[in-house]
Design a protein with these regions (language model features):
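Membrane-proximal helix-turn-helix segments that form the acceptor-binding/catalytic region
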Residues: 18-34
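Nucleotide-activated donor-binding/catalytic signature segment of Leloir-type glycosyltransferases, i.e.
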Residues: 121-142
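Conserved acidic donor-binding segment of nucleotide-sugar-dependent glycosyltransferases
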Residues: 137, 191-202, 211-216
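Aromatic "clamp/platform" in nucleotide-sugar-dependent glycosyltransferases that forms part
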Residues: 159
Length: 264
């Protein structure tokens, strides 16, 4: 289960929509022998809905696609028309309400120079804002990786994120992450790989960005890459998931580590 449809229903239609969707959610998932959750946050939401047999297994990241050597800051600065002293904050994703892109925009406005927010895909249809640059949606993940790696930090303000795969992709690119201390992102991001804002609020978020840049962001970025490699590379994640499948089927040899790599 990689989403919280009840929370999304409440966000878009009001709190009245939460319970009916939650009941439908529980009715569906209670039919399964195992329910796999990508985070403790979603596991708790499942338990609240009356679902059991929950196992937490995170998603994985393509560490060969998202990697630090795609970084080309001079190329990106030239594309954006910015000077070398600019501090580039990147967000890539859908322009959905739950992403709290407005919090990112307001935070950058509060910070002022030299910060700039680069929205990849998420700025579609939004009015022009000072210090906010919208880039089109990129289908090629390598193109996304190049942009993320070429920025200084990745920003993500969704406080109800089930997991946050794009956050892992930014970490794999060697970029520190500024998140919110809520939802699935808070289980991945800590001070070793970034900074967490107390709330999804422009003031708190701006403070978190400043706190990150007061530290050694390159060292933090290297730690982020190391964590992505050691804990979230797909060969490791896939092996753990297949062990769960093997336990369910009674086949302890469901997959071997070398096979997990080959299948991926």
């Amino acid at each position: 289960c990689h989403s919280d449809p009840a929370a999304l229903a409440a966000l878009h239609f009001g709190e009245w929509a939460k319970k009916p969707v939650e009941k439908r959610w529980a009715k569906l998932f209670c039919q399964f022998d195992r329910v796999v959750s990508p985070s403790r946050y979603i596991a708790q939401r499942l338990e609240e809905a009356g679902i059991d047999n929950i196992f937490i297994r995170p998603l994985g990241v393509e560490i060969d696609t998202f990697r630090p050597d795609r970084r080309d800051r001079d190329w990106l600065l030239k594309r954006l028309g910015l000077d070398s002293d600019a501090r580039l904050l990147c967000f890539a994703g859908r322009p959905a309400k739950e992403k709290n892109v407005d919090v990112l925009i307001d935070a950058v406005q509060k910070l002022g120079a030299p910060y700039h927010l680069v929205l990849v895909g998420a700025g579609s249809g939004m009015p022009d804002e000072d210090r906010v640059i919208s880039l089109p949606y990129e289908k090629d993940p390598r193109a996304v990786a190049r942009i993320i790696a070429s920025c200084d930090a990745f920003v993500h303000a969704n406080d109800k994120e089930p997991f946050g795969l794009i956050v892992l992709e930014a970490m794999a690119c060697g970029r520190p992450v500024v998140g919110v201390n809520a939802g699935g992102v808070a289980e991945t991001v800590d001070e070793s790989v970034g900074q967490l804002a107390a709330r999804a609020d422009a003031d708190d978020y701006a403070q978190a960005i400043e706190a990150l840049f007061a530290r050694d962001i390159e060292a933090i970025g290297r730690a982020a890459r190391a964590k992505a490699e050691s804990q979230f590379a797909w060969n490791r994640v896939f092996e753990d998931l297949c062990m769960l499948y093997g336990d369910l089927t009674g086949d302890a040899a469901f997959v071997q580590p070398s096979e997990a790599w080959a299948v991926h």
